[in-house]
Amino acid sequence: MALQSLPCRHGSPTIRLTADTPIVPDSERLPLKRDEPGSRSMRSTFIPSSQCSNLSSATASSSRRRSCRRYQHGEAVASSSTRWRTKWNLFIICLLLLCLPGLAVRYMHDMFSPCISGVANSQHSSSQSPRSHCRSLVPSFIAIYSASVVLCALISCFLDPYETTLPLTNVTNCLTLFRSSGSLRSEHRCSTSDSRRSRQQLSITSRGSA
């Protein structure tokens, strides 16, 4: 059978057609339907094979940008109100994290105070063991921890439960979208390899038939 090669648009690879393949001219094609009277008409566009690889990555990057950035029109008030709430949350976390360093500084000060004050004071404090120091620090630790818990409870009473969460949702969304984009890229690689194999098989069969 005779083969006819027709070049495609935008520099895509040629398509081989047989003599029996009907070719419909542009004048006999049906007009395209429109969605709405005020919208643009749906036109058929030819996407080359070289741009298919960039399509999935572009859609994934645009979705990551939309998920990571804040909305400017619909939720502008909500985004501005959550800023000071996240500041309160960070303040609470810093308060909880600063309890242990404060206790450690106090313990180290009690241990190294003999070296600073002198020998007489060191003889007085030598009778105290490290266990006694730890026992003296336990009530202060309990008092600081209970005060921080009460402060967290008071602040959480004035906040919404949805807005008291830390701003980690955007990070998790970005990670999930990044993983999905990686899966899309792997699927596209598999599809391109399958298309290459099918093209090779078609070329082999066309050569054998010729």
From Swiss-Prot:
It is an enzyme of class 3 (hydrolase). It catalyses: cutin + H2O = cutin monomers. The keyword rRNA processing does not apply. Signal peptide: none annotated. Residues 49-58 have a biased composition (Low complexity). It comes from the Eukaryota. Its EC number is 3.1.1.74. Residues 26-38 have a biased composition (Basic and acidic residues). Residues 26-58 are annotated as: Disordered. Keywords: Hydrolase, Serine esterase. One of its GO terms (molecular function) is cutinase activity. This is Putative cutinase. The lineage of its organism: Eukaryota, Sar, Stramenopiles, Oomycota, Peronosporales.
